[in-house]
Amino acid sequence: MPEVAHNGEEEVETFAFQAEIAQLMSLIINTFYSNKEIFLRELISNASDALDKIRYESLTDPSKLDSGKDLKIDIIPNRLERTLTMIDTGIGMTKADLINNLGTIAKSGTKAFMEALQAGADISMIGQFGVGFYSAYLVAEKVVVITKHNDDEQYAWESSAGGSFTVKVDTGEPIGRGTKVILHLKEDQTEYLEEKRVKETVKKHSQFIGYPITLYLEKEREKEISDDEAEEEKEEKKEEEGENDKPKIEDVGSDEEEEGKDKKKKTKKIKEKYIDQEELNKTKPIWTRNPDDITQEEYGEFYKSLTNDWEDHLAVKHFSVEGQLEFRALLFIPRRAPFDLFENKKKKNNIKLYVRRVFIMDSCDELIPEYLNFVRGVVDSEDLPLNISREMLQQSKILKVIRKNIVKKCLELFCELAEDKENYKKFYEGFSKNLKLGIHEDSTNRKKLSELLRYHTSQTGDEMASLTEYVSRMKENQKSIYYITGESKDQVANSAFVERVRKRGFEVVYMTEPIDEYCVQQLKEFDGKTLVSVTKEGLELPEDEEEKKTMEENKTKFESLCKLMKEILDKKVEKVTVSNRLVSSPCCIVTSTYGWTANMERIMKAQALRDNSTMGYMMAKKHLEINPEHPIVETLRQKADTDKNDKAVKDLVVLLFETALLSSGFSLDDPQTHSNRIYRMIKLGLGIDDDDAPIEEASPSVPDDIPPLEGEEDASRMEEVD
């Protein structure tokens, strides 16, 4: 609850800052930052947003501008009072807005920004996290915000950043509509009252803001007047200001043609004060200019003013479309991904929509598909109506054509970027997930997007290769692109699944991001070559006649063992077969063509809102493949042929299956039982009799039906474990 104090007749409410905001302000105030000038950029950006909002509302209700038709930003330095004031005629804030937006409700980015700051990030990132207002405390010891919204009274917010702020009804000079921010500057920050400093800061950060930014300065100039006028003026000054504040009068002599003769009336020069006003951002919208006339520096400055980014963009596309439909667009790719790129609740405001240079909105979902939500820029249409509503936008055919063109130009830009290996590497690190999401969602552009993918492979080492490069290296008899999905490059490179494929000299693509699983569900082929997972059934490697003959012989030789293993494992596997993919591993678990891979199963198990009925169906399709050339499998076959009811055979089959599950990337349903089997085998290997073990109460997690292994009589025999 706020504290309420009565100052005369004024009611002043005091509120505590929300904890994270108080922490952020403390960080801003008590840490030294060299580039404090960004506070001006942030306040101008907030003013511009407020002006955008009132202009958008006025398109459907022109009376909203009755409280002030001019949409502008004024900057007023005052040396005497050591204040820097910024006034906008934007939408203003109600009392509730003032309390919520400036102190009691933390934005989602507050904590993320503090973490970034503590990790060494630049203070100039503040605008990207939605907390730019608080940068005012980089230069101010006290901030006063006076604001008037059409639906409320004029209020004043004030804080010296001591953990609290006050709000009261403002009885001072009415501002009509909008917001006035008064910064009471720290003693060592008076440079921001200087004309040159303000001008260069606005030019650097805010010259492309779409509203006039006017600087008001009190200046002096010399004025020539007659002695009589000087006397009159002196008297007036005395009355108005008192004797102490009279203007300094400078006598510059008299104008005489001949001394002592024909005297003319004497004149004086006095210094008078006046208010000089200068518009600081006269540059016309950059997207309306010819791209050939715009320098990279200008693009960079515009990008920074548009996005509040502290770094230059990575790439830019400036184009216009003419004909039946007319629009201009300027698109940028950031140098790095924002912290909340895939946050569902995030307001999408990366592309600003203008109609004939008038800003309409900055959250138009229909303008660009979700997978391109990192692209920043502006689109200026000549054909959309000025008063278009969101509902009309959803149905607009014009917008659908604009969207199609934007996607096409974005893909062109990505392809151009791909020609520069170093820059594309930076781009891919930040936005590869977006490209893969595009392959999953955008069937029209799937082929183009697939050309932009880059993966580590069994032949590229630390470098990444495109699928086009993979195809160019394919062997003559190779018909498919082989890939494996998993958690990391090292894990998949050492997987049993790639043993035979690599030994035969075929390249394997390593897919190590969870989104790759969704991507390959849609990307069935590339350049006429089918994508084949080496972890699924039906892997067919090119074979000569000798290899085919050997495979058939092994199938016959191990047929009875496969049948026995299927009986022992029952519903745990769909079938047991002889493998053509293993070299040094005794066995592996593969999934059916349409089932989930081990990696996909892991991803789905991690989903909080998973569908258990689907999981039960998809997870059941496991196939056990055995390596006919491995001594463990060969010895097991011999034991099974001798006595298929041998308990040791059954135990070893279960142990082999569970170990294969783990090595193939699956998880165990009952890891404790598996662990107990391993412990008993370790005891057997160490020659420890179960009778020698310390007698303790049985753990409830250890099933009673796992008897000790009979190690002394026959080291190879074990009790059956169900």
UniProtKB/Swiss-Prot annotation:
In the resting state, through the dimerization of its C-terminal domain, HSP90 forms a homodimer which is defined as the open conformation. Upon ATP-binding, the N-terminal domain undergoes significant conformational changes and comes in contact to form an active closed conformation. After HSP90 finishes its chaperoning tasks of assisting the proper folding, stabilization and activation of client proteins under the active state, ATP molecule is hydrolyzed to ADP which then dissociates from HSP90 and directs the protein back to the resting state. Residues 225-234 have a biased composition (Acidic residues). It is found in: Cytoplasm; Dynein axonemal particle. A motif (TPR repeat-binding) lies at residues 718-722. The keyword Cell membrane does not apply. Residues 221-268, 690-722 are annotated as: Disordered. GO terms for molecular function: ATP binding; ATP hydrolysis activity; ATP-dependent protein folding chaperone; unfolded protein binding. SUPFAM superfamilies: ATPase domain of HSP90 chaperone/DNA topoisomerase II/histidine kinase, HSP90 C-terminal domain, Ribosomal protein S5 domain 2-like. Pfam families: HATPase_c_3 (PF13589), HSP90 (PF00183). One of its GO terms (cellular component) is perinuclear region of cytoplasm. The modification Phosphoserine is found at S226, S254. Its main location: cytoplasm. Keywords: ATP-binding, Chaperone, Cytoplasm, Nucleotide-binding, Phosphoprotein, Stress response. The keyword Nuclease does not apply. InterPro entries: HATPase_C_sf (IPR036890), Heat_shock_protein_90_CS (IPR019805), HSP90_C (IPR037196), Hsp90_fam (IPR001404), Hsp90_N (IPR020575), Ribosomal_Su5_D2-typ_SF (IPR020568). Gene3D superfamilies: 3.30.230.80, 3.40.50.11260, Heat shock protein 90, C-terminal domain (1.20.120.790), Histidine kinase-like ATPase, C-terminal domain (3.30.565.10). GO terms for biological process: cellular response to heat; protein folding; protein stabilization. It comes from the Eukaryota. In contrast to other HSP90 heat shock proteins, this one is not induced by heat shock or mitogenic stimuli but is strictly constitutive. Molecular chaperone that promotes the maturation, structural maintenance and proper regulation of specific target proteins involved for instance in cell cycle control and signal transduction. Undergoes a functional cycle linked to its ATPase activity. This cycle probably induces conformational changes in the client proteins, thereby causing their activation. Interacts dynamically with various co-chaperones that modulate its substrate recognition, ATPase cycle and chaperone function. PANTHER family: HEAT SHOCK PROTEIN 90 FAMILY MEMBER. The TPR repeat-binding motif mediates interaction with TPR repeat-containing proteins. Belongs to the heat shock protein 90 family. Monomer. Homodimer. This is Heat shock cognate protein HSP 90-beta. It comes from Xenopus laevis (African clawed frog). The gene is hsp90ab1.
